[in-house]
Amino acid sequence: MTWGADRLDQIKGGDTPLPPVVQTLKLGGLDDWGEGWVRKTWTPAPELLNSDGSLFGGYVAALADQILAFAAMTVAPADALFRTSNLKVDFIRVGKAEILAIEGRVVARTKGMIHVEADFRRPDGELIARAFAQQVIVPFGG
């Protein structure tokens, strides 16, 4: 197993504390994963919503960065890390105070880059956002 697979198994199993930023932002962990894909459900806390009960777009971007990183971890090389070099979120519908199904997937992996995308769906299956990122592969210590 690679460091990414080990870490994803720990997060899925609840066997490790989540990083402070994840705890502070209430991003949560991970429900399931396999090579090239990840999945989680997430319920927004009331204090994370706009005054009209909608999801704050910047918060959706933080969730996107997390799920896209999880997806990249499924194919990350054993001898390297990665860093987000580009993140784009397309907002399709207004998100509300309801459970979201979030799925990330690897679109392509080259020697130096991992391309990932994610969908955010409300309980009725309607797409509310789609996110895209490029993860630059960097050697450990680099």
Segments the model singles out, each with a brief description of its role:
Residues M1-G142:
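Terminal targeting signals and extreme-terminal segments of soluble enzymes
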